[in-house]
Regions:
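N-terminal secretory signal peptides and thylakoid transit peptides that target proteins
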Residues: 1-13
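Short amphipathic alpha-helical surface patches that mediate protein-protein
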Residues: 11, 85-89, 226
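Class I SAM-dependent transferase core
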Residues: 26-132, 267
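Conserved nucleotide-cofactor-binding alpha/beta core module
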Residues: 129-250
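Active-site capping/gating segments
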Residues: 236-280
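Boundary at the C-terminal end of the N-terminal hydrophobic targeting segment
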Residues: 22-24
């Protein structure tokens, strides 16, 4: 059975879990003005089954994880909560980790890299304060989950992956999901390159998110960030990074400064290492 086909309605939720036979495809149209209900778990699951054709089991896990994200103050903005709820994390993990899609932990996706835990993705993304008009650059496409999440916040998402086969695999995944009805992923432009140098062709960017650890802020990324733009980046030695919010300020005389703050209050949050010719 195609995992993207499920029954309509409340009765359909239970029947779908039992292998029901009446199916509905995901609508091709994407409406920025529509959000799933947040009153109850059942209402959310029913709405998503009816309107997005997703698996009620994973929808329930997504809902449960959201409650923990909110209680831990990993997500707080309504637009970011909507983006989290609209992004099926289960589509971006490997088959062997499907049952663990919404666990707190980073999960292996091959090529020596991981999909970041949902709590860290949520906090880093919420810290960016993405507006609909923003242009957002991601360094480290990885599984594709982060940019999929961002595509529910802005239609201007750019993502760079340095590992060629991973970049190809994730681009193919986006294209498959677009064909299945996730038209919001058309907003994601991808590139196989060294993210240290950013993406000058599409610069400047209002927001930049880096999903791998490095011991300094790459100057090309700072140059491609707009004045008052925000970068969220794990900075520090291997395995001992602090997730930094860096805000670029430009004085009247043209000088540039960076205002830094630690979004985890000094806690160490380990990330896979930045790779490339200027990784450290």
């Amino acid at each position: 059975m195609d995992r993207r086909k499920f029954l309509f309605g409340a009765a359909g939720v239970a029947a779908a879990a039992q292998g029901g036979a009446a199916f509905a495809r995901v609508p091709a149209a994407y409406d920025w003005g529509v959000s799933p209900p947040r009153g109850t778990r059942d209402a959310f699951v029913e709405w998503m089954v009816r309107n997005r054709g997703e698996d009620p089991r994973f929808l329930g896990e997504r809902w449960d994880r959201l409650q923990q994200l909110i209680s831990h103050q990993d997500v707080w903005d309504e637009a970011d909560i909507r983006a989290y709820l609209m992004t099926p994390r289960e589509d971006f993990v490997t088959a062997e980790n499907l049952d663990r899609a919404y666990e707190w932990h980073h999960l292996n996706i091959g090529f020596g890299v991981t999909i970041t835990g949902p709590h860290t993705v949520a906090r880093m993304t919420n810290t960016l304060a993405v507006r609909r008009s923003d242009r957002v650059l991601e360094i480290g496409t990885g599984s594709g989950y982060q940019s999929a999440y961002l595509s529910n916040l802005t239609p201007n998402v750019f993502s760079i992956e340095i590992i060629p086969p991973l970049a190809q695999r994730t681009r193919a995944l986006y294209d498959r999901l677009i064909a299945e009805g996730y038209s919001e992923y058309r907003a994601i432009r991808t590139r196989n390159a060294d993210g240290y140098y950013g993406w000058e062709e599409y610069a400047p960017f209002d927001k930049i998110i880096v999903t791998c650890g490095i011991d300094h802020i790459p100057p090309p990324l700072l140059q491609q960030l707009t004045p008052d733009g925000i970068m969220v980046i794990p900075v520090g030695p291997p395995g001992a990074q602090h997730v930094i919010k860096a805000v670029k300020r430009r004085a009247p005389d043209g000088s540039v400064s960076v205002v830094r703050s630690d979004i985890y209050g000094g806690a160490i949050i380990p990330f896979v290492p930045f790779t490339g010719t200027h990784a450290s």
